Structure formats: structure tokens, C-alpha cells
Amino acid sequence: MKITALLVLKCDPETREPVILANVSDLSQFGKFSFYRSNFEEFIVFIARTVARRTPPGQRQSVKHEEYKVHAYNINGLCAVGFMDDHYPVRSAFSLLNQVLDVYQKDYGDTWRFENSSQPWPYLKEASDKFRDPAEADKLLKIQRELDETKIILHKTIDGVLARGEKLDSLVEKSSELSLASKMFYKQAKKTNSCCTLL
């Protein structure tokens, strides 16, 4: 999954064009001296301004363009725009944009309202690198991934025990810890389940 660009823009309804306050892009897919690199940078700026201008304050929106999704989040005229590949989860993208706006407002306060040009902001590059993995941006996605990994480990462990030549049926029969009623319940449940799978 790839984050191609992150931008922070001032979207003042009184001005025609949104002003780019900070931006970072990863155009490594194009060669260092490639003709397409400068064209793609212009494309990013054009699309970012267009999407930011059309994202009302307090709103979020996503626009799909070819293999990219452009996500925008506008908070009272301060708008974050992200260019991600199509596989980057939407929820993670908006979580990242929200965090970018929070940190920008903490760093600059309301001074952004008076800015009319792009300023270097190192955090944007840090965020682009750190959140390349969507689980870093979305804590629920991270928890889900950890649960999935735990489930895989549990399945491997159970399969490993059973793969040593022991079957669950023989373990139940040999068990002295299970009561006769529990053993009968296991056998009846197994018969019921096998009956249902044949249908």
C-alpha cells in the first residue's frame, strides 16, 4: 500500500484557489529525471486543489482516479488531502488526515489563516513514512490484524497437536478428565454435525 502524496491546504471561500500550506510526495515510481515526474507533481497539485475546493467544511470525501484514491478532510477551511493507492483502507486514510490536521493546528494554531504560500513542515514526511502501514493510522485495524495473527497461531497449535498422529476422537476416548456425559455429548454432537454436512 502506498501513500503518494499528502497536502495541507487553506480553503478560504473568499479566495478562488486553495493555498497549499505544506506538501510531501513520493514519486519514486518515476525516475529522478523523468519527464513524467514534473507532470505528475502538477497533476497532484491540480487534483488536490480541486478536491479541497469541493470539500465543504466539516466534511470528508473520497474520489477515485485510475489506481488512486484521493481523500480529503476539511475542518473549518483547513483541509488535508491524501493520494493513496486503491488498496489503502478508507478508514485508515481519514484517520491519518485527521491526525495530520490535529498536529498542524497544534504546531501553527490559527496562523495558517494568514499564510499564502507553502512552508516546510517536517511532520508531513514523518506521517507519510509512518502511516504507510494502514494499521499505524487505524488502531482498530491494528487490533484486528493482531487478533487474526493470534487465531492463526492457535489453529497451527491445535493442528500441530493433532498432526502428531492423535485424533480428537481418540483423545476424548482416552481422557479421564471428561465425564461419561461429556463424552456422550461429544459423540452426539459429532453425529449431528456430520449428518448436517451430508445434506
Swiss-Prot record:
Q: Where in the cell is it found?
A: Cell membrane
Q: Name one GO biological process term.
A: vesicle fusion
Signal sequence interval, chain numbering = none
Alphabetically ordered keywords of this record: Cell membrane, Lipoprotein, Membrane, Methylation, Palmitate, Prenylation, Protein transport, Transport
**Propeptide positions, renumbered to this chain?**
197-199
Principal localisation: membrane
Cellular component GO terms held in the UniProt record: plasma membrane; SNARE complex
Entry-annotated residues carrying Cysteine methyl ester: 196
Q: Has UniProt tagged this entry with the keyword Zinc?
A: no
Q: Which residues form the v-SNARE coiled-coil homology domain?
A: 139-199
Lipidation residue positions, type S-palmitoyl cysteine: 195
Domain (Longin) ranges: 7-131
UniProt-listed PROSITE patterns: LONGIN (PS50859), SYNAPTOBREVIN (PS00417), V_SNARE (PS50892)
* Bilayer disposition of the protein: Lipid-anchor
Q: Where is the lipid attached (S-geranylgeranyl cysteine)?
A: 196
> One Pfam annotation, family name?
Synaptobrevin
Taxonomically, the superkingdom here is Eukaryota
Q: How does it assemble?
A: Interacts with SYP41. Core constituent of the SNARE complex required for membrane fusion at the trans-Golgi network.
The entry's function note states: Involved in the secretory pathway. Essential for membrane fusion mediated by either SYP41 or SYP61; triggers the fusion of phospholipid vesicles containing SYP41 or SYP61 and VTI12.
Its family remark reads: Belongs to the synaptobrevin family.
| Annotated protein name in UniProt | VAMP-like protein YKT62
Q: Which organism is it from?
A: Arabidopsis thaliana (Mouse-ear cress)
Name of the gene: YKT62
